[in-house]
């Protein structure tokens, strides 16, 4: 029997393979062995029946029926029928070479949760008791074929549920054939509607032909659950197949050790790297002294990117390289590389890609458990991030996911509008702010930015040099006095209108009307994501899912290059104040990894 494909698709099913041959969609379609053909034939029968029987919620019902073991409800008209049904089902099970204990008859109360491996849970009920989750079949209906199907695929890694898992499916564009498509075959459109990838767009037909519909030698294994891979549960000595090599970043120490052993067991041709290290040089002479000193001893820089966004070796313009590859970077290896990718993106510096190599050892401090939590889309998210750390980019992705977004700078901007009116002025200030245009909002300075700018002038008159002149190399008494003065102002200000009180009032006003910082109205999904600058603001919201965003680039250099705010000097000092204030606290997640994971999630919608 052939192995599990990298992605499920309609060409594994009899109807899909018939269409492929009829319309010459695919060449050299591998003929399935009889055992596979029989399995996919029975899977197709149930999928087609489900789609036709439960038009609106067939996926949910199928999930209940199959995801945690087999569960089926059979309804009967009289109690005498019940006894006969039990006997017929038991006889059917035994006739298929299974033990009678394979089937367990249960009550409605126990018709929930997980089922033991290699067991079928059957709920026998009289008709008219109302709906339950999952599948319901009448006794006079075709229940025997359904139970037979359950017995046939019991214990198999290929189930009907696998065909509707969004992360495991790959669509094929059937629209060019829709006019001539037989009505009885249009259920395939419903089947692949939620799949996140598409042949010819995000996955090539060549890869599909090789791995999906499908090659005998191919099973792509990984040491943990991962899209497009099958988790390897066997012994080290028994490993045969291709290994998806994941970076240490996303693995526990135990998983990483097991992967290393599998890599030594597998042949090099069996490696399937999912992430790569791209090394490049910059084709420019650096004149800025701070940047020049930081990069003086480093000539080659690097970043990590997924296999779907790999550059070829060669020269690229800074603009093209930034858009196509740096925007997809999931991490960097060192501080000089953070500087380099910030320079390339901000100054459009041309680059020369020297090498692209698969990577397994990359780790930047991200705790991947927090990524998994965020991907579950909790109702309340609070993310701590530096100034210039890429929060705006994240906020747009969360908006696409249906979140109501509160930007980190909004708190300070609204406090500027509140002025000296305190809590009494908050409602009026919020009503005004959520109805401002994006340009009008940009023109409103943050109260914290205004105060830092004022203090920079005060301490500048005492001899404090501008930030860009040696501040990163040395800090003296005036720097500490500057931050101490700002700390006093900051502590006093956040106690007048606390961050948590502000957040509650902001979302309440947004629900009444107006727009958030991404120009969107209030989302009815009632999910919120709040970006903050500091730990004190974060502690005001301990109750949601909390994380700190670690930037992939140099935030100081990004602020210097973009030149936003009242002054670059004040922005840079604010940046350092927040960094010093935060230190260690929340679980950390790399900006690149989180953006990468959320974009993968968006593909599934």
UniProtKB/Swiss-Prot annotation:
It is found in: Virion; Host cytoplasm, Host cytoskeleton. This is Microtubule-associated protein VP10. Minor inner capsid component. Displays NTPase and RNA 5'-triphosphatase (RTPase) activities. May function as a cofactor of polymerase VP1. Associates with microtubules and plays a role in the formation, structural organization and morphology of viral inclusions, where the assembly of cores and the replication of viral RNA occur. The lineage of its organism: Viruses, Riboviria, Orthornavirae, Duplornaviricota, Resentoviricetes. Keywords: Host cytoplasm, Host cytoskeleton, Virion. GO terms for cellular component: host cell cytoplasm; host cytoskeleton; virion component. Transmembrane segments: none annotated. It comes from Colorado tick fever virus (strain USA/Florio N-7180) (CTFV). Interacts with VP1. Its main location: virion. It comes from the Viruses. The keyword Transferase does not apply.
């Amino acid at each position: 029997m052939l192995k599990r494909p990298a992605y499920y698709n309609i060409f594994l099913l009899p109807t899909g393979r018939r269409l492929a041959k009829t319309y010459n969609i695919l060449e050299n379609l591998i003929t399935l062995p009889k055992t596979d053909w029989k399995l996919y034939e029975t899977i197709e029968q149930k999928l087609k029946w489900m789609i036709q029987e439960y038009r609106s919620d067939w996926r949910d019902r199928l999930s209940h029926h199959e995801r945690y073991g087999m569960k089926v409800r059979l309804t009967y008209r009289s109690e005498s029928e019940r006894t006969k049904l039990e006997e017929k089902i038991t006889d059917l099970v035994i006739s298929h070479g299974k033990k009678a204990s394979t089937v367990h008859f249960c009550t409605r109360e126990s018709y929930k949760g997980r089922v033991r491996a290699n067991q079928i849970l059957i709920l026998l009920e009289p008709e008219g008791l109302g709906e339950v989750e999952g599948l319901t079949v009448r006794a006079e209906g075709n229940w025997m074929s359904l139970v037979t199907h359950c017995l046939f695929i019991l214990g198999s890694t290929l189930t009907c549920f696998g065909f509707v898992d969004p992360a495991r499916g790959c669509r094929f564009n059937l629209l060019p054939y829709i006019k001539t498509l037989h009505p009885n075959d249009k259920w395939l459109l419903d089947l692949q509607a939620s799949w996140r990838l598409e042949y010819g767009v995000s996955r090539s037909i060549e890869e599909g032909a090789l791995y999906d519909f499908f090659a005998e030698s191919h099973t792509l294994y990984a040491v943990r659950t991962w899209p497009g891979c099958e988790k390897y549960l066997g012994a080290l000595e028994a490993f045969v197949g291709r290994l998806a090599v994941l970076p240490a970043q996303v693995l526990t120490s135990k998983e990483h050790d097991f992967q290393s052993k599998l890599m030594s067991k597998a042949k090099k041709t069996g490696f399937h790297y999912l992430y790569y290290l791209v090394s490049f040089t910059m084709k420019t002479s650096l004149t800025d002294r701070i940047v020049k000193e930081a990069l003086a001893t480093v000539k080659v820089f690097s970043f990590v990117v997924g296999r779907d966004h790999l550059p070829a070796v060669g020269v690229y313009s800074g603009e093209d390289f930034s858009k196509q590859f740096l925007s997809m970077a999931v991490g960097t290896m060192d501080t000089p590389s953070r500087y380099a990718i910030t320079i390339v993106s901000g100054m459009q510096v041309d680059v020369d890609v020297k090498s692209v190599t698969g990577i397994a050892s990359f780790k930047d401090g991200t705790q991947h458990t927090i990524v998994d939590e965020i991907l579950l889309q909790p109702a309340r998210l609070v993310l701590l991030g530096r100034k210039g750390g890429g929060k705006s980019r994240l906020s747009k992705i969360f908006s696409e996911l249906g979140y109501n977004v509160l930007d980190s700078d909004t708190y300070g901007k609204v406090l500027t509008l509140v002025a000296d009116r305190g809590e009494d002025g908050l409602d009026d200030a919020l009503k005004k702010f959520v109805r401002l245009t994006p340009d009008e909002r940009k023109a409103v300075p943050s109260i914290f930015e205004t105060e830092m700018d004022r203090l920079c002038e005060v301490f500048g008159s005492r001899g404090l040099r501008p930030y860009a002149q040696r501040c990163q190399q040395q800090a003296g008494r005036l720097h500490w006095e500057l931050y101490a003065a700002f700390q006093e102002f900051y502590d006093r200000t956040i106690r007048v209108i606390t961050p948590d009180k502000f957040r509650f009032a902001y979302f309440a006003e947004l629900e009444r009307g107006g727009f958030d910082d991404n120009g969107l109205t209030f989302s009815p999904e009632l999910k919120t994501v709040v970006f903050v600058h500091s730990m004190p603001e974060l502690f005001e919201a301990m109750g949601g899912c909390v994380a700190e965003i670690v930037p992939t680039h140099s935030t100081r250099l990004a602020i210097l290059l973009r030149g936003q705010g009242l002054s670059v000097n004040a922005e840079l000092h604010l940046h350092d104040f927040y960094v010093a204030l935060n230190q260690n606290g929340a679980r950390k997640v790399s900006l690149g990894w989180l953006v990468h994971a959320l974009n993968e999630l968006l593909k599934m919608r």
